[in-house]
Regions:
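Substrate-binding/active-site clefts of carbohydrate-active enzymes
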Residues: 2-135, 140-166
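Conserved alpha/beta catalytic core and glycan-binding cleft of carbohydrate-active enzymes
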Residues: 135, 150-151, 156-236
Length: 236
């Protein structure tokens, strides 16, 4: 689960509840202070060092597809104030982008627009920070399809993918995609670049059905168990 600084949604706060999941980010570079005793950066570095000493890699769950600012009715906390029209994607109106309607392919009120150079640079800088300064070993990207949308559509040759591959720091770390979002044609399992690993929900569903005793699952179970060649032919 994410460790970058996050906020509770206004609706939860109205109900007296707290978001402990972390999928509502507000600062891409900052460790969540509530997870530490006071010196969050120092404590995070110490944690990573000790995990490495124990022979464990550190893979961060990161959320760069949206922020806690939500849609047009949400608060102005960060990116909206800097450049709302640049950092976020918007629905298309009769005469171009409708800046009163944030695109919402994430289901969280807004969608960060990595088709814009400022957004792309922000995310790349944040990733490099976690690798070079915090010494993590890789990332699991929440709703990764959103990061590769250009003009609203998923592009396996997007600027985001190209930049990740060309970056001397990021090209050597582990990259894991959640290969979907809720936007049009948002399910993209098996369509990420070969340098990426993908969360395989077909494996999850098939194994569950097999152990549940559903009929006719033996062949599909075997396919999933040996690597889902039908979904990931580029890796064979």
């Amino acid at each position: 689960m994410p460790v970058a600084a996050f906020m509770s949604e206004p609706r939860l706060e109205q109900l007296g509840l707290t978001n402990y999941w972390g999928y509502n980010p507000i600062a891409f570079f900052a460790p969540e202070p509530r997870y530490g005793a006071g010196e969050a950066v120092t404590e995070f570095k110490t944690m990573v060092r000790e995990l490495h000493r124990a022979g464990l890699e550190v893979i961060l769950d990161v959320v760069y597809n949206h922020t806690a600012e939500s849609g047009a009715d949400g608060p102005m906390l960060s990116l909206k104030g800097f450049d709302n029209a640049g950092y976020y994607a918007f629905e298309t109106g009769a005469h171009g982008p409708d800046y009163h309607r944030h695109a919402n392919v994430t289901g969280c009120g807004n969608s960060v627009n990595l088709d814009h150079p400022n957004s792309l640079r922000l995310v790349l800088d944040a990733l490099r920070y976690w690798v070079t300064e915090m010494q993590v070993d890789g990332f699991r990207f929440d709703l990764a399809v959103t990061l590769a949308r250009e003009a609203g559509e998923f592009d396996p040759m997007s600027a985001f993918f190209k930049a990740m591959l060309a970056d001397p720091v990021l090209a050597r770390v582990r990259l894991i995609a959640e290969p979907w979002d809720i936007g049009p044609f948002g399910y993209r399992l098996g369509q990420f670049p070969s340098q990426w690993l993908e969360i395989n929900d077909r494996y999850r569903d098939t194994v569950r059905a097999f152990w549940r005793g559903d009929a006719g699952k033996m062949g599909d179970f075997a396919t999933r168990l040996v690597g889902s060649r039908d979904l990931f032919p580029k890796n064979w």
